[in-house]
């Protein structure tokens, strides 16, 4: 069955991998990539599919409600996969309102547009029995983060039932957007699904996050700034595995439900950085241990959660998903991609990136 799917944030890191998968795997679908092309949005990420007959790019901002209305009307949007977001914790500490506008107000704009455009197809008769009854098949799929759950202790995993406890402006804004999506499901009977993922890594990642930032710095023999004692722990998920999970949840997930997507793959920051240094030294032909000399411990950031770890058992048992790439394999492939795409890396790290980098990491 044909669909007209709006993917927001489709020129970004995760979004571009989702767009590529949907365009190539489902030729009967028309895929509309909506992106404002802010600093992390890059159409070069999608050059390989830009001429595909079922791919369409729309430059717009989810804060523009009128633009959203026009897009839904013009393209008869049947489904939404919502990835557009401000996503970097450090930036949220500097400019929290930017995160409120995009992640909260932008999401509500999108929800309102979907609700109004699809209302003739949605039945309001089954208000309280937990079922969805629509004449047509619609879905508003909201992609979120494990950071909404707060910080874990040394034991345990985040489950779909874990209470929210956000500790940064970023995670607070994403928690608010999650709540709005579920509220629209309950109040207006909008067919929704939510997923919360762990830390992603892979090709096309803007170098403000740990792995691409440190790859860039190792290439250029710049300091590797590690926050605090380096023992903060994260669960890492290869972005292509995440895109596979999104595809599966979109097609087979239960409407109204939440799914956690994780890599079952915990690393402390310092151990990850040392592994990265080892692999980079081998690939760059450097002396073993050379890049580790670049590690510099810097002042911790405010509200730094100690540990995140996702329990993706529900997704595995109900839909059969599991990660297909080991961390060592994924990291090696990621490094290779950046080494083979140095022009892309230098292009995205010019201009305003340097101002931001100096503000965040110089003289800490």
What is the predicted function of each stretch?
Residues 5, 18, 31-32, 38, ...:
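C-terminal substrate-binding subdomain of Rossmann-fold SDR/epimerase-dehydratase oxidoreductases
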Residues 49, 156, 207-215, 276:
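A glycine/serine/threonine-rich, flexible loop-to-helix segment
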Residues 204:
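Conserved GTPase G-domain signal focused on the G5
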Residues 1-200, 240, 250, 269, ...:
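N-terminal Rossmann-like NAD(P)+-binding domain of SDR-like oxidoreductases, especially those catalyzing
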Residues 82-83, 200, 208-209, 291-293, ...:
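Short secondary-structure boundary micro-motifs
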């Amino acid at each position: 069955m044909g669909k007209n799917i709006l993917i927001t944030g489709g020129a970004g890191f995760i979004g571009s991998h989702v767009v590529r998968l949907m365009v190539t795997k489902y030729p009967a679908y028309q895929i509309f990539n909506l992106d404002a092309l802010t600093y992390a949005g890059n159409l070069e990420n999608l050059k390989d599919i830009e001429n595909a007959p079922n791919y369409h790019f729309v430059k717009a901002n989810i804060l523009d409600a009128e633009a959203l209305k026009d897009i839904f009307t013009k393209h008869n949007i049947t489904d939404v996969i919502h990835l557009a977001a401000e996503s970097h914790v450090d930036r949220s500490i500097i400019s929290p309102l930017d995160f409120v506008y995009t992640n909260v107000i932008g999401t509500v704009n999108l929800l309102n547009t979907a609700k109004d455009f699809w209302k003739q197809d949605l039945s309001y008769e089954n208000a309280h029995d937990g079922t969805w009854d629509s004449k047509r098949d619609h879905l508003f799929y909201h992609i979120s983060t494990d950071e909404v759950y707060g910080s874990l202790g040394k034991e345990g995993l985040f489950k779909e039932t874990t209470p929210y406890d956000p500790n940064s402006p970023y995670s607070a804004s994403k928690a608010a957007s999650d709540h709005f999506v579920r509220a629209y499901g309950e109040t207006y009977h909008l067919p929704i699904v939510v997923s919360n993922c762990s830390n992603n890594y892979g090709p096309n990642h803007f170098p403000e996050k740990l792995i691409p930032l440190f790859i860039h710095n190792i290439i250029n023999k710049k300091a590797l700034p590690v926050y605090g004692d380096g023992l903060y722990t994260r669960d890492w998920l290869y972005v292509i595995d995440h895109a596979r999970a999104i595809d599966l949840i979109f097609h087979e997930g239960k409407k109204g439900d939440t799914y956690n997507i994780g890599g079952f793959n915990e690393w402390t920051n310092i151990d990850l950085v040392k592994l990265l240094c080892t692999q980079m030294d081998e690939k760059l032909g450097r002396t073993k241990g050379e890049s580790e000399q670049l590690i510099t411990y810097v002042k911790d950031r405010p509200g730094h959660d100690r540990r995140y770890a996702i329990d993706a058992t529900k997704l595995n048992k109900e839909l059969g998903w599991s990660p297909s790439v080991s961390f060592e394999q994924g990291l090696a492939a990621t490094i290779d991609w950046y080494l083979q795409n140095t022009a892309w890396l230098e292009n995205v790290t010019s201009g305003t990136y340097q101002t931001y980098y100096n503000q965040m990491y110089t003289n800490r």
